[in-house]
Structure formats: C-alpha cells, structure tokens
C-alpha cells in the first residue's frame, strides 16, 4: 500500500525526477537483478551499454516492468551529466569591474588579507590562526601565526584580483619586508 502511494507520488513529480522514477521502480520490481544493478552503480562509465529508449509516456508504466539493467544504465548516464555541475566546489575567481568604463577593480579582501612583494610573491597567514585559540597549544598557535608564501596558482589569481596600483614598489620608512622584496637567489 505504502509502496504504491510512493510510486504514484514519484510519477506525479516533474520531468526532472522521471529518471529517478525509472531507476527506483526498476530496482523495486527487479529484485532478482540487484547484483547486476550494484555492479553497474559501482562502475564509473556507463557509455558502453546500449539500450532502447522509452518513447511515450502512456507506455512508461508497462515498460518499467520490463526494464533490464542496461536501461537503468541509460538513466544513470543521464543523471551523471548533471552531477559534475552540482558537486563542483565553490571557487573564488571574482574580478570586479567598474560600471562606467569596464575596467577591473581591486577586491578589497585581497588587500586586507595578503601582502604582495615586489617580486610577485604573495604572503599570507596560515588558515585558522584566529580560530578556536582556547584549545590550541602554544606551539601550534605560534606556527599558525607564521607567514607563508602562496603558490603559483594562488599568486596568479590574486594578481588578477588587484590592479596595477597595488603592484607598484613602495618605499616605507621601517618596512620589515624590505630585504625580501627582491629575489637575490635566482641564477641567470
């Protein structure tokens, strides 16, 4: 009773849920083919399996009973195309542009959190140096306060997020980083 109500609710859903309806119904009705379904689910690519396509909606209920493991693979192929867009990790590649001339603008968070040396290297604090200090040891807090260099990918991204104003050489009176601005260990 509950299973038929669930199947009816899933069938009434939009077209996005239709592949899931086929997959759930076939898994429920074809209990003897669970081993085949598990082997298909565990594999990475489903493109080598060719199956007939269900064409009309009225025949959907009758065709669900006759589903084979190959047809569930077709459903998984359709769903696999949607997954990379959903599961992408968030990436900060924002560069602000002015509304008047369309020039790039500086992202202020970069200026506050990072220090750019004139050689193009970027300095930053280690992540978490201000967080949950009550449960960190003194040695760990000292290690977190240290400055580290950003890698090449991060440096290129930070250069895109800042304008040329922030890349010029500055001559501060008591600059503690004065000796680090120029690279002296490069062999020409």
Swiss-Prot record:
One of its GO terms (biological process) is translation. Pfam families: Ribosomal_L35p (PF01632). Its main location: mitochondrion. InterPro entries: Ribosomal_bL35-like, Ribosomal_bL35_sf, Ribosomal_bL35m. Disulfide bonds: none annotated. Belongs to the bacterial ribosomal protein bL35 family. This is Large ribosomal subunit protein bL35m.
């Amino acid at each position: 009773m509950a299973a038929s109500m669930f199947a009816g609710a899933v069938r009434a859903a939009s077209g996005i849920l239709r592949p899931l309806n086929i997959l759930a119904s076939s898994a429920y009705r074809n209990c003897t083919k669970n081993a085949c379904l598990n082997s298909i689910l565990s594999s990475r690519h489903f493109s080598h399996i060719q199956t007939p396509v269900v064409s009309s909606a009225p025949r959907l209920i009758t065709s669900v009973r006759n589903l084979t493991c190959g047809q569930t693979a077709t459903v998984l192929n359709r769903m696999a195309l949607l997954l990379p867009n959903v599961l992408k990790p968030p990436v900060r590649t924002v560069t602000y542009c002015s509304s008047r001339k369309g020039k790039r603008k500086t992202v202020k968070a970069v200026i506050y959190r990072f220090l750019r040396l004139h050689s193009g290297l970027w300095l930053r604090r280690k992540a978490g140096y201000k967080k949950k200090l009550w449960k960190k040891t003194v040695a760990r807090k000292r290690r977190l306060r240290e400055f580290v260099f950003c890698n090449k990918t991060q440096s290129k991204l930070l250069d895109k997020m800042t304008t040329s104003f922030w890349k010029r050489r500055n001559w501060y009176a008591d600059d503690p980083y004065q000796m680090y601005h120029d690279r002296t260990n490069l062999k020409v």
